[in-house]
Amino acid sequence: MAYVTMKQMLETGVHFGHQTRRWNPKMRPYIFGARNGIHIMDLQQTVKLFRKAHDFIADNVAKGGKVLFIGTKRQAQEAIAAEASRAGMFHVTHRWMGGTLTNFQTIKKSIDRLKKLEEMFEDGSIKRFPKKEIVMMGREVKKLNLALGGIKDLNGAPAVAFVIDPKREQIAIQECRKLGIPVVAVVDSNCDPDMVDYIIPGNDDAIRAIKLFASHMADACLEGAARRKEDKAMEAEETKAAEKAVETEAKEETPQEAK
């Protein structure tokens, strides 16, 4: 179990909030103070709340749940996509399409279109179309992949959403709340913490800070997946042992019945 440490947070600038004039008063409990007009986050609380969020995600994945990583701001895109992929989870790193979760069946049609086009390019059947159409379809694939590539294997609602900057991702969070999907989020000093179920107070703008949080949340997913694999293996062994015991008992009873 690899929790993020206070040293790592300090090194990546997690403690730096926004300018004091841009703060949300609801974040007061998570702010240590101010320096040069910048709010400083209380990292003791961040460490504690991060561990709580980490365990929540690991537990959900251990039960078979999937996590949707959301971070569409430029600074977050690369880290969110890379870490979600490393963990075998889903991600949205470009503009959130309204209805991605609440109107998933409509979004699914676009995903199916993307998969069909990719298959045609892969097996060569695309060659039966005129060159002009092939170029247009190639552009369509690129556009659809940009918007939906990170969720094209998503078959239903995720168990948890991990969000960078809930202020920017308000529409995504509203959809999660409507569907009862718990939200874990990195919440900066200018955000409303009431929108989030599991708050991680910290810098949601610095690339290194975002990468730190995303990588550790990916680790939480991998930890949960490993636990699930172990539980399944243990369950299979117990089932096998029980079947063997029943078989042995049946063999022992057979001679007595014969008498």
UniProtKB/Swiss-Prot annotation:
Extent of the signal sequence: none
Annotated InterPro entries: Ribosomal_uS2 (IPR001865), Ribosomal_uS2_bac/mit/plastid (IPR005706), Ribosomal_uS2_CS (IPR018130), Ribosomal_uS2_flav_dom_sf (IPR023591)
GO molecular function per UniProt: structural constituent of ribosome
Pfam families: Ribosomal_S2
GO BP terms: translation
Chain segments carrying region Disordered: 232-259
CDD domains xrefs: RPS2
GO cellular component: cytosolic small ribosomal subunit
The entry's keywords: Ribonucleoprotein, Ribosomal protein
Family: Belongs to the universal ribosomal protein uS2 family.
Protein name in the entry: Small ribosomal subunit protein uS2
Lineage of the organism: Bacteria, Pseudomonadati, Thermodesulfobacteriota, Desulfovibrionia, Desulfovibrionales
